[in-house]
């Protein structure tokens, strides 16, 4: 007897190209009813139960909108000021390019007319104008205590932690030479006779 096997074809193509198509065909309630049914009911009830909450939210959004408008007006004003300043500097630059000799002399005159002084207050609150006196008054001096000792010389010893470090480095150097010497002797291959 011959058994006949029937083949079933399975469609593996995507049923919808986008989620929008599925929602448009079946609707949001059918697709989301099983997953979000309780959550949607709670959200729906919360929205319509408390009208004062809606009023408060409306006031907050109005306040935020008003503040955003004020900030945008302030930004517009600052941008317009910056544009005006840019135009003025462009015009000044254009003038400098047209008559470079005339403006250089004017600039030099203004530099010579301005005088920069560093006023250093003295004890009697009279400013010092002489550069030599000013430099002398600005100097700072540090005095140290007299060193102790017979002839005025001071012997500085190493800090105890530094002494320990010196000992360790000497020990390490001695240890490092011994393994090199022994390793050199025993590393040679013995010749078989």
UniProtKB/Swiss-Prot annotation:
<protein>
    <recommendedName>
        <fullName>WEB family protein At1g75720</fullName>
    </recommendedName>
</protein>
<keyword id="KW-0175">Coiled coil</keyword>
<comment type="similarity">
    <text>Belongs to the WEB family.</text>
</comment>
<feature type="coiled-coil region">
    <location>
        <begin position="57"/>
        <end position="99"/>
    </location>
</feature>
<feature type="region of interest" description="Disordered">
    <location>
        <begin position="152"/>
        <end position="174"/>
    </location>
</feature>
<feature type="compositionally biased region" description="Basic residues">
    <location>
        <begin position="161"/>
        <end position="174"/>
    </location>
</feature>
